[in-house]
From Swiss-Prot:
Site for Positions MEP for the nucleophilic attack, residues: R164, K220
Pathway: Isoprenoid biosynthesis; isopentenyl diphosphate biosynthesis via DXP pathway; isopentenyl diphosphate from 1-deoxy-D-xylulose 5-phosphate: step 2/6
Listed Pfam families: IspD
Annotated GO biological process: isopentenyl diphosphate biosynthetic process, methylerythritol 4-phosphate pathway
Annotated protein name in UniProt: 2-C-methyl-D-erythritol 4-phosphate cytidylyltransferase
NCBIfam families found in the cross-reference section: ispD
Species this chain originates from: Pasteurella multocida (strain Pm70)
SUPFAM superfamilies the UniProt entry points to: Nucleotide-diphospho-sugar transferases (SSF53448)
InterPro entries: IspD, IspD/TarI, IspD/TarI_cytidylyltransf_bact, ISPD_synthase_CS, Nucleotide-diphossugar_trans
Swiss-Prot/TrEMBL site (Transition state stabilizer) positions: R24, K31
Keyword terms, alphabetized: Isoprene biosynthesis, Nucleotidyltransferase, Transferase
Signal peptide: none
Length: 238
């Protein structure tokens, strides 16, 4: 499955799933609405994507009863479109993909970057590397594992040590042809498969996405300690 796609014919959109509640942050609001340097994490994330010239449109998937999204000043940007999120990340992403497919005549020309709402430290340099991938397998940003990784037993004792030389930590954006990813997600959901990211759906469908080495500061704000780190990384770009 290595059909080349000419980069000159591709059109790129972004889908940002932002319907989660972020319970691990132990805050009174979803993590994407926490403020860093006067802007929400979501605003930082959207600003990076809006500033990348190859992205034509950003589909933002939010919860139907989201009480915070109306305060986002970027909602009036002509490139941003809201869609209702689903009960899972995969459902939210699929809703975003379907919104694109229903709005264009030929979705075969479109590729999508799916990016976490709570990953605000993305750089355009990493996006430049990601868009170099040309075949239907697509690609994801990722970093090689550097820590020693242990496989655990059910009682949290060590079972054995993994060979980290072949292990990578997945990041986002994850970059795929829209039609191919939509089909892969639909198949995975229909089969009840655990889809933790878009690449896993593509893997279930028989594709082998490329790993593009990203930056270690492209962190996802998931736990309270991540907040201070993101605050530091974002302070360098002010």
């Amino acid at each position: 499955m290595t059909t080349p796609i000419a980069k000159s014919t591709r059109r790129i959109v972004a889908v940002v799933p932002a319907a989660g509640i972020g319970s691990r942050m132990q805050m009174d609001k979803p993590k994407q609405y926490l403020h860093i340097h006067g802007k929400t994490i979501l605003e930082h994330t959207l600003s990076v994507l809006l500033g990348y010239p190859l992205i034509e449109k950003i589909i933002l998937a939010v919860a139907a009863n989201d009480p915070y999204i109306s305060t986002c000043p970027l909602l009036t940007h002509p490139k941003i479109q809201l869609v209702e999120g689903g009960s899972s990340r995969a459902d939210s992403v699929l809703n975003g993909l379907n919104a694109v497919k229903s709005a264009v005549q030929n979705s075969e020309d479109f590729w999508v970057m799916v990016h976490d709402a709570a990953r605000p430290c993305l750089t355009h340099q990493d996006l430049d590397k990601l868009v170099q991938v040309e075949d239907q397998n697509g690609a994801i940003l990722a970093i090689p594992a550097t820590d020693t990784i242990k496989r655990a037993l059910h009682n949290q004792q060590i079972h054995y040590t993994e060979d980290r030389s072949q292990l990578w930590l997945a990041q986002t954006p994850q970059f795929f042809p829209i039609a191919t990813l939509a089909q892969a997600l639909e198949q995975a959901l229909a089969q009840g498969l655990q889809v933790t990211d878009e690449a896993s759906a593509m893997e279930f469908a028989g594709f082998r996405p490329h790993l593009v080495a990203g930056r270690s500061d492209n962190i996802k704000v998931t736990r309270p300690e991540d907040f201070a780190l993101a605050e530091f990384y974002l302070s360098r770009t002010k």
